[in-house]
């Protein structure tokens, strides 16, 4: 019997492949995206020291109270704007975008566009 790997296993394989090439430095850290069925998370990571510099998610009170349901594109755009504002406040202007093995479409694309709107460059 042939067993088809789940989409998450395939995503993790893609993510490992991408992580070999995408590396966050202190000058240009990595903007990592993780999406679940009901929420979306973003982190700005410096891989040289393995430290998260800034993070934002749709679970935060300011986003959840404004939107209610947070598993949609509108919430992803708000998370992108929030993580960009926090990064700019910490002096981070340029990042490397790590889509986490997800295709650049839907919520991942909206998060990236929201971050660009707020002034983050990648």
Swiss-Prot record:
GO terms for molecular function: 5S rRNA binding; structural constituent of ribosome. GO terms for cellular component: cytosolic large ribosomal subunit. InterPro entries: Ribosomal_uL18_bac-type (IPR004389), Ribosomal_uL18_bac/euk (IPR005484). Pfam families: Ribosomal_L18p. Keywords: Ribonucleoprotein, Ribosomal protein, RNA-binding, rRNA-binding. GO terms for biological process: translation. The keyword Membrane does not apply. Part of the 50S ribosomal subunit; part of the 5S rRNA/L5/L18/L25 subcomplex. Contacts the 5S and 23S rRNAs. This is one of the proteins that bind and probably mediate the attachment of the 5S RNA into the large ribosomal subunit, where it forms part of the central protuberance. Belongs to the universal ribosomal protein uL18 family. This is Large ribosomal subunit protein uL18. The lineage of its organism: Bacteria, Bacillati, Bacillota, Clostridia, Eubacteriales.
């Amino acid at each position: 019997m042939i067993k088809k790997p789940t989409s998450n296993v395939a995503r993790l394989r893609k993510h490992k492949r991408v992580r070999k090439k995408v590396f966050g430095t202190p000058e240009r850290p990595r903007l990592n995206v993780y999406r679940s069925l009901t929420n979306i998370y973003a982190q700005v990571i410096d891989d040289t020291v393995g430290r998260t510099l800034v993070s934002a998610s749709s679970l935060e009170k300011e986003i959840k109270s404004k939107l209610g349901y947070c598993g949609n594109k509108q919430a992803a755009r708000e998370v992108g704007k929030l993580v960009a504002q926090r990064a700019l406040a910490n002096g981070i202007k340029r990042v490397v975008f790590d889509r986490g093995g997800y295709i650049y479409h839907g919520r991942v694309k909206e998060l990236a566009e929201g971050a660009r709107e707020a002034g983050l460059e990648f």
